[in-house]
Amino acid sequence: DNVVVYLTVLTDMTTLNTQTTRGPKQRREREKEALRQVILDAARELFVNEGYENVSMRRIADKIEYSPTTIYLYFEDKAALLFAVCEETFAKLAKRMESISRKSTDPVETLKRGCRAYVEFGLKYPNHYRVTFINHPDLHLGRENYLREGSMGMKCYSQLRANVEECIKQKRFRHGDLEALTQLMWAGGHGVASLLITKPDFPWVNKDKLIDLMIDVLIDGLKA
């Protein structure tokens, strides 16, 4: 009985020690992730308002009231920080697109909803969109890094491509050039999103009407 009691106490102490050790570690991880997000948010805002070329790591550090050394603990250089900002945008977009794909079995309907979601995403997160799609981050990162294999950017593009490919396989479109059609759909959505974001004072018609019309014109023109 004493052995059983001893083993029980020992087990409880081990569990307590593990929980005690795990608690501070988990807290540190949360704090680390929170600070990383603060850095990303500050960098995104500065890149939009002042231009990537004009923003230094020290400028970002000043904004969040930390030393530049702290930022370098999270990001190797400014290009790595820009890439992380873009990846965050693509990750948000990819998650939205995945949700749409799961809820629809009709590839054409999925494509329509995806195009609308793309534009709506840009309007909901204009700073994310500006940095990632309008301010030419590829010029600073290099095309091979901006759209490198395994990146969230390529994941988003691959989702769109797979959707268009399914429309072609089911003979829903009369054209079969997969790459051209994928790029066309992206260009259409980007055109509307970027103009609505960068030209807010233009006398646009109702935004929903404009988005729906763009989608209908593109897809109806492709239907078999």
List where the protein language model places each region.
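N-terminal intrinsically disordered/low-complexity leader segments
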Residues: 1-34
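Hydrophobic/aromatic-rich alpha-helical bundle segments in the mid-to-C-terminal region
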Residues: 14, 144-146, 168-215
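Generic hydrophobic, amphipathic alpha-helix propensity
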Residues: 32-43, 60, 85-97, 160
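Helix-turn-helix
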Residues: 38, 42, 46-80, 84
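Amphipathic alpha-helical linker/stalk segments
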Residues: 85-113, 143-150, 156, 163-166
